């Protein structure tokens, strides 16, 4: 079996934003485990942070699938924050602030806590990096210490939808706002082979609610940043970046948990398509 540390290679997995589509990472993970390919680090952004965290902690795949079923349900966006909505029109009276969101975050936070508990980055067996965005200056923020729930909660804080999350005194929002596929984090940490799983979001034909409108704007920005990121990092000379881009023939929406088995299969298929090249790189001297 091939292992990632043979010949001095350092292999990283980066999983970008994509909500339910990020479950495709479980299919990729299945291929890596079957082939005996070890990861030296994992990097997650937005929805991708859920699965990279599960991998880094050594959770079983079945457990991670259950997380998907619990998290991406209508319940997490059903509890409207009416005070927050009114604060848009009466900002002074209702004290509009950085923690604004159209949806209360109690359900999503409860789901994350039930799965990850109080585990911290120190509990991981594989180095983990989670990317969020500073709300006030737009900087990309790489989290690698503290509670994992806090890091994920910050990384999935879709602007306008869920409130920003405070970590180490900084108000943080969705990592996709600064970099939807942060391969540069893995490069800076010394990876020379990077498996980059990214997702594009198709535009919605009709936008029927403020929540959908917020997600649509988020998708447009994410798609543009993703394309720009790939174009830029493909110019790297000392790092092999292997794009793993699942090709979904079905429409995968925010709440499409019934399609999770299909999403995982497509992730596995996309990984297998790149497997010969991955083996070739691992067999070569770093």
Task: Tell where the protein language model's regions lie, with residue ranges.
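Patatin-like phospholipase
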Residues: 1-45, 53-286
